[in-house]
Amino acid sequence: MTLSDSDLELITTELGRELTPAEAALFENLWSEHCAYRSSRPLLQSFTTGDDSANDEGAEHVVIGPGDDAAVVRLPRVDEASETPIYITMGIESHNHPSYVDPYDGAATGVGGIVRDTLSMGAYPIALADSLYFGSFDRERTQYLLDGVVEGIADYGNAIGVPTVAGSVEFHNKYTGNPLVNVACIGLLTDERLVTAEAQSPGNKLVLVGNATGRDGLGGASFASEDLSEDAETEDRPAVQVGDPYTEKRLIEANEELITAELIQSARDLGAAGLGGASSELVAKGGLGARINLERVHQREPAMNAMEILLAESQERMCYEVHPDDVETVGDIAAKYDLGYAVIGEIRDGNYVCTFGDETVVDVPAGFLADGAPMNDLSATEPPTPEESTFPAIDAATAFNTIISTPNTASKRWIYRQYDHEVGLRTAMRPGDDAALIAIREAGVGLALSSGAVPAWTESNPYKGAQAVALENATNVAAKGATPIAAVDCLNGGNPEKPAVYGAFKDIVQGLADMCHTLSIPVVGGNVSLYNDSTSGPIPPTPTLALVGTKKTFDAPPAALTGDGTLLLVGHQSNNLGGSELLAQIGGTDKFPALPSNPTAVVDSLARVANHPSTLATHDVSTGGLAVTLAELITSDAGARVTVQNKTSLFTETPGRAVIETTDPDAVRHIFEGVAPVVSLGDTTTDGTLTINIDDEDTANESPAVTTDAATVAKQRRILEDALE
């Protein structure tokens, strides 16, 4: 990738001279789509971010919104009289292209990068969530990528001691040439520990702490701003970073000590565009400049030139602004943790200047470098959405057995059992449920976390599908009794220069923004990843959302039946099958299901039901519809006898619904009165069997439409384990 003629003309006109090679490379990376959001930034104004405290609903929780390394959200407290506010940080990143070229290192360094974004704010990382998207599971290449990505996430996350507690995995043939790896991180801090990525004062020193700089990851930002080529695995390997989790662990602990000692004025991790990106963005945000001596950067490879030192994306490095009086102490702490350390320059008024030997290799206005890229004016065409119902007939038993044994509905235990999800002793609800639940004892609240998207939904109808993604994640945390308070997004799309691709991308942005606004959930930060396009075509528009909610306890009803209650289905239901797993398996098209007109009331009511003492189990209805929800709820000790109105009721994926096991059905009906329908499904049993009757088919037939048991279902849902073990 090189600078376009128009960009080059704009830059040389601004500077009044030709660019040095280092400047050209720096602008190429910082003005890339990956760094500058040239095709998406105007669209992001649709989101309610909480920055406008007077007008944004949900803003009372937002301390720092979009624009920093991570967002900062104030947690509500059980004891409101406490004087110490407790904050969490929220961040999400993509490492899509690197994970195709090198799935292990690509995914591992994705984890490392989002953790360092957390460190930049003065927070300690306490939880990870990973949302992964791959091509058709039956392909050998897909299984290779899945195996490598999961191993990379597990090895890195486990080694640094941060639990991976939530996430999602989706398979769709349009990810075959371009998988997605989206990783979110939650951090914890108090208000006095808060640091930002905004340079504070001229005269302060810039200090580099962490790994030595090598040549790995060169041009990573520009690499992430192009379609993947057929030869990407070999040609683009140098653009993929190599991680060292044990250095990252030492960096986490050193950062904690530096923040505790109040030695850090501002901070930024070295991610996209390396030292050049981190240092220029830090001073630009403060309206300042810097003078950096590149020869002072500690290096692990010989004869590195200025451009390589500036742009290498070697991992496990932090750039700190430090008062001159504190520089020696920072060096002592770095040495204590066996970390590299170098005073590379200082913050000044004026330009961003880098020297190498006796030569000035960069001398540009920091604000122009960081924020001067012009936005793209791209054409967009409205994506077609199905309007007719055309799909083959299929009997309920065949449909049920088909739908519970697909890669998308299969058990993901093979994946999350590789993650240490309990390190840190905060995990109150483990992976495999609707949402994770993390104990924030400092505030006396439980923090529920859900992350994911459903590409079949957004492919069927980008706008409504994105709305459904937001509602689905909100429903997940509500099903565990939590009230949503904030979210971050990772907006993944194909090549935006294709009008159809850009049109669908615009729709997912607007759909996600509209539903989050309706739910009063501020989207406090995020990431955009475009050019997820390859020789096999663009990916489906994929709006990953990581959403948190809070509750006053550290426990929640599980997504597993007890055998002691009545089963109810709560929420509005549409009989359309658009975007469903059933249609993905049997073929055909249908309209996307209608969404509830009162989603906030539905989510609030579900949270109240989940916290009611009569509630024994809760599980939201999502991919695979009610059929999969019921299959996931039964255990060897608890089954169910269920009756539904029609076959479509089993397979529609209308979001905003949940199955409740309760000993007091009237209490559930009272809570949902005037909000959404409450349908009696039947009773639970203690024999581990599931029988489903369908009213409109079985009136003259005494045998159930579906009969199965927990052992059979578990075997059918083992397809990932059977293929990969």
Curated annotation (Swiss-Prot):
<feature type="binding site">
    <location>
        <position position="241"/>
    </location>
    <ligand>
        <name>substrate</name>
    </ligand>
</feature>
<feature type="active site" description="Proton acceptor">
    <location>
        <position position="95"/>
    </location>
</feature>
<dbReference type="Pfam" id="PF00586">
    <property type="entry name" value="AIRS"/>
</dbReference>
<dbReference type="InterPro" id="IPR010074">
    <property type="entry name" value="PRibForGlyAmidine_synth_PurL"/>
</dbReference>
<feature type="active site">
    <location>
        <position position="34"/>
    </location>
</feature>
<comment type="subunit">
    <text>Monomer. Part of the FGAM synthase complex composed of 1 PurL, 1 PurQ and 2 PurS subunits.</text>
</comment>
<feature type="binding site">
    <location>
        <position position="489"/>
    </location>
    <ligand>
        <name>ATP</name>
    </ligand>
</feature>
<keyword id="KW-0963">Cytoplasm</keyword>
<protein>
    <recommendedName>
        <fullName>Phosphoribosylformylglycinamidine synthase subunit PurL</fullName>
        <ecNumber>6.3.5.3</ecNumber>
    </recommendedName>
</protein>
<feature type="region of interest" description="Disordered">
    <location>
        <begin position="220"/>
        <end position="241"/>
    </location>
</feature>
<feature type="binding site">
    <location>
        <position position="37"/>
    </location>
    <ligand>
        <name>ATP</name>
    </ligand>
</feature>
<dbReference type="InterPro" id="IPR036921">
    <property type="entry name" value="PurM-like_N_sf"/>
</dbReference>
<dbReference type="GO" id="GO:0005524">
    <property type="term" value="F:ATP binding"/>
</dbReference>
<feature type="binding site">
    <location>
        <begin position="313"/>
        <end position="315"/>
    </location>
    <ligand>
        <name>substrate</name>
    </ligand>
</feature>
<keyword id="KW-0460">Magnesium</keyword>
<keyword id="KW-0436">Ligase</keyword>
<feature type="binding site">
    <location>
        <position position="117"/>
    </location>
    <ligand>
        <name>Mg(2+) 2</name>
    </ligand>
</feature>
<feature type="binding site">
    <location>
        <position position="529"/>
    </location>
    <ligand>
        <name>substrate</name>
    </ligand>
</feature>
<dbReference type="Pfam" id="PF02769">
    <property type="entry name" value="AIRS_C"/>
</dbReference>
<feature type="binding site">
    <location>
        <position position="269"/>
    </location>
    <ligand>
        <name>Mg(2+) 2</name>
    </ligand>
</feature>
<feature type="binding site">
    <location>
        <begin position="94"/>
        <end position="97"/>
    </location>
    <ligand>
        <name>substrate</name>
    </ligand>
</feature>
<keyword id="KW-0067">ATP-binding</keyword>
<dbReference type="InterPro" id="IPR041609">
    <property type="entry name" value="PurL_linker"/>
</dbReference>
<keyword id="KW-0547">Nucleotide-binding</keyword>
<comment type="pathway">
    <text>Purine metabolism; IMP biosynthesis via de novo pathway; 5-amino-1-(5-phospho-D-ribosyl)imidazole from N(2)-formyl-N(1)-(5-phospho-D-ribosyl)glycinamide: step 1/2.</text>
</comment>
<dbReference type="GO" id="GO:0000287">
    <property type="term" value="F:magnesium ion binding"/>
</dbReference>
<feature type="binding site">
    <location>
        <position position="116"/>
    </location>
    <ligand>
        <name>substrate</name>
    </ligand>
</feature>
<keyword id="KW-0658">Purine biosynthesis</keyword>
<feature type="binding site">
    <location>
        <position position="93"/>
    </location>
    <ligand>
        <name>Mg(2+) 1</name>
    </ligand>
</feature>
<comment type="similarity">
    <text>Belongs to the FGAMS family.</text>
</comment>
<dbReference type="GO" id="GO:0006189">
    <property type="term" value="P:'de novo' IMP biosynthetic process"/>
</dbReference>
<feature type="binding site">
    <location>
        <position position="527"/>
    </location>
    <ligand>
        <name>Mg(2+) 1</name>
    </ligand>
</feature>
<dbReference type="Pfam" id="PF18072">
    <property type="entry name" value="FGAR-AT_linker"/>
</dbReference>
<dbReference type="InterPro" id="IPR016188">
    <property type="entry name" value="PurM-like_N"/>
</dbReference>
<dbReference type="GO" id="GO:0005737">
    <property type="term" value="C:cytoplasm"/>
</dbReference>
<comment type="function">
    <text>Part of the phosphoribosylformylglycinamidine synthase complex involved in the purines biosynthetic pathway. Catalyzes the ATP-dependent conversion of formylglycinamide ribonucleotide (FGAR) and glutamine to yield formylglycinamidine ribonucleotide (FGAM) and glutamate. The FGAM synthase complex is composed of three subunits. PurQ produces an ammonia molecule by converting glutamine to glutamate. PurL transfers the ammonia molecule to FGAR to form FGAM in an ATP-dependent manner.</text>
</comment>
<dbReference type="GO" id="GO:0004642">
    <property type="term" value="F:phosphoribosylformylglycinamidine synthase activity"/>
</dbReference>
<feature type="binding site">
    <location>
        <position position="526"/>
    </location>
    <ligand>
        <name>ATP</name>
    </ligand>
</feature>
<dbReference type="InterPro" id="IPR036676">
    <property type="entry name" value="PurM-like_C_sf"/>
</dbReference>
<keyword id="KW-0479">Metal-binding</keyword>
<dbReference type="InterPro" id="IPR010918">
    <property type="entry name" value="PurM-like_C_dom"/>
</dbReference>
